[in-house]
Amino acid sequence: MKNENETEQACLLRLTKKAIERTGRAAETKTARRSITVELPEEINEIAGNLPALTLDIVPVLIPYDKEKDPMWIADRELRQWCYTYPNSQLNDSVDRNQQSEKIDGYFSYKSLVKMIKSWKKVHFGKNKTPKGFILECMVAQFHNPQAKYWVDAVIDFLQNVCNVYPDPNGLQYIPEVHDISNLNPQTIPIAKTIESARHVLNKMHWSLTQVKLAKETAETNLYQAAKILQLVFGSDGSMDLCFPLPEEDDTKRNNVASIAEMGSKHDVREAPKFG
């Protein structure tokens, strides 16, 4: 039931929030512009098994014609209107894009790179809203090199392509926009709400590019030091549960390239699961 003076869009989000809160699991919910953000704490359940902490953005979608066809509608609380969304083509185009990228260490590189850049965001921006994870995925889709043969080159090529298009973040006079991951969506999406936020994101990408290039050069003579540099970009042990793994510290093994591959962990940002 819509409240007095409440828009249809605000009503849909409010009812979605109430439905989530009735699920029975303790959750902290917050209404965003187009979604409901849900923070689920870890839950100890000796019968059904423990449930891990989880953060979700739940977007209610209205299906005007057919659930298999785009576009659909989502509520925009700030604009007070319905906006098109393309969930089917977003998924299908992402799968195609991923499978058309080179495999590196057994993984298609596109989706793995998305996970790495989202980990990068967590290290440098924490829980800040900017840059949004979806925006970073759009940026990877637009600027990645699907032919990259090695992870370090996949990261360098992505960052280099971004920096080539935006060589002077401090001189920006407008907020850059990127294409949606859906090839059907004709609209572009701003990478931030303000020019200052956009400059901050792009400056961090410029800095990261410099560091990753330095790490690649350093790896030719000192693999351990190269990994330490990459930890500045992708996190170190104990840093927000993310890490770039170090090779063995033994001087006789510091230049052993294979040692990095052997030191895998569930928090290794390079170990994205298979996709598609």
Predicted region positions:
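A generic structural motif
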Residues: 2-6, 146-147
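Extended, alpha-helix-rich binding/interface surfaces that flank or overlap catalytic cores
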Residues: 47-115, 264, 272-276
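Conserved catalytic core of two-metal-ion nucleotidyltransferases
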Residues: 4, 9-69
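A long, hydrophobic alpha-helical segment
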Residues: 92-147
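Hydrophobic, Leu/Ile/Phe/Ala-enriched alpha-helical segments that form helix-helix packing faces
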Residues: 16-27, 121-124, 162, 166
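Hydrophobic, mid-to-C-terminal alpha-helical segments
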Residues: 124-176
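Terminal (often C-terminal) interaction modules
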Residues: 171-276
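Generic solvent-exposed, charged/amphipathic alpha-helical segments
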Residues: 13-21, 114, 118, 141, ...
